[in-house]
Amino acid sequence: MWRTAVIIGVTSALWAAGKQGLSIGSIMLPRLGCLQLALVAASIYITTGGYYTLWLAYKTLPRDLVGGIRFVKVQLTLKWALYRNTTVPKLFMKNVRKNPNKVALIFEGQTWTFAQMDEYSNRVGNFMVEQGYKHGDTVALFMHNRPEYVCIWLGCAKVGVVPALINFNLRQLPLIHSIKVADSKAIICGEDLQDATDAIREEVNLPVYVSGCGTAAPSLEGAKNLDSLLCASNPTPPPQIDSVSAKDKLIYIYTSGTTGMPKAAIIKHYRYLFFCTGVHYMIALGEDEVIYNPLPLYHSAGGMVGMGQVLIYNNTAVIRRKFSASQYWVESKKYGCTVAQYVGEICRYLLNTPEKPEDTQHKVRVMFGNGVRAQIWNQFTSRFNMPCIAEFYGATESISNIMNIEGKPGSCGFVSVLFRHAFPAYLIKIDEETGEPIRNKNGTCVLCKPGEAGEFVGIIKRNHPMRDFHGYADRNATEKKIARDILKKGDTAFRSGDILIMDELGYMYFKDRTGDTFRWRGENVSSTEVEGVVSKVAGNKDAVVYGVEVPGAEGRAGMAAIVDPEDELDLHSFTLSLKDVLPSYACPLFLRILKDIDVTGTFKLKKLTLQKEGFNPSLIEDKLYFFDSKLQRYVVLTAELFNKIDQGQAGL
């Protein structure tokens, strides 16, 4: 009897949700009919016998149903694509036939139609075959953002050649590593990156093709002019398109390198489709969107999630060579953008720009990406009149991806608390000393309760379009990301390396990277949370926080590095504000004032080098300060004071 009630209730609710849909403009959840909601709630109560579960159903079921419907759409789309052996080029060519003259890309005033992209990519594909590159060969693509960049990797994909999308900011050793780890057979570089390519020629002796020279000869000795060669190439579709499978490698995309050398993540055709489809359906995008995408196209956010809306879903994208905070809203208004992307610290950079009319004169109704700090969320939506921020959590290679479809401030997504195993991703407890999972007497992992911090992991299911982990080009790196015996003996999971917290309604909140949480005064300190506070108190300046070892003291003391090239920081007011919002153990013991800071290509601040340098004024030229607990203020960290701290005489 109760099973019948469940079926009737859920079916009724799904019918109501499907009928009423979702308001795309505001990303509001549908209002379920009272009867349908009552049936669902009663069904759950019968099966569980708890008032608490009824309350959870009341609070979360509308969200879960909308998310569930969309999730099913994503799954069906992916399974159908696998069944049809659909590849990214095939889906793109379908859009070409449908709308050949529709604008696909806008770049610095230029427009590229779908037909133009198709012809250029056909030339690339045929050229690669003519040059002897075979299915499965890798070619390093080292270029700045421009339409040709997308067309080149798309053309390679048409014939099964795998482009490795290299970060255009890399030089010397990291660049050499990125090219070699993917086993590249050749390099395609931009005209303006010839010097960087020339600097590594002794270590990387590969054929080089230069894009962007026009009719001029490349300045790089021995390199070939790709533009001229493509002009002579066949513009018709290469016959090898049909020999490429949905399970073949499409591209390599590299991790950001915030904690070491970039890792080359394997992206297969259906994996690319998963990323694009997930965002497309979860935030209810249409086919006539104009997407502002100022992100680097070598990264998953810009090159997969953003560009995939063009290649797979027939939308238009506005791209630019490099991100500009001052031009973000100006160009969004100019090109009539309806959707915009962000990543990392971009939203804070936008808040730091002077107010101007374009801040609210745009047509953008939803922004999606990851990296908005909870401390600036409401300020951002208010200033820029933004109906919804669709923050998502995930990584290029991750299988535990979630999304905030309601615009709930601070949240990076949700999982259902009523149907917990519908999406097999969990928070597991981690040993703070070793970083390894804590296990119960059965040898399986201990799951976190609401409010407890843990590492987010996703259960791996081989050959599943959404849950298979394809790993990296480096097999050792792949093995390090896999945990075993999570829920039961023999299962495996992808380790995100990120610490999240889930509230009782299933909303997830990013807390920290594993290893970024440090312990001081017997308390755990989240560097990410303190960074958000320090940055806001300092006037939204770039800031990183990390733990440093202090001789004679247990744990690590907090140290904040703040970018303040104009020497604008008022230490007195900064200290007072910091003490008002942070507990004493979380307040940084040391300050370092920087002229600038290294940033990854995806606008994440690097701090590993800063952490290694510590707080020795004899080794650091930047201004250093120490918080004097007796004076209750920051004082200049002199060599004499450093010696006292080093000898355990500073009263810590």
Question: What positions do the PLM features span?
Answer:
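AMP-binding/adenylate-forming catalytic core of the ANL superfamily
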Residues: L170, H177, I187-C189, A340, ...
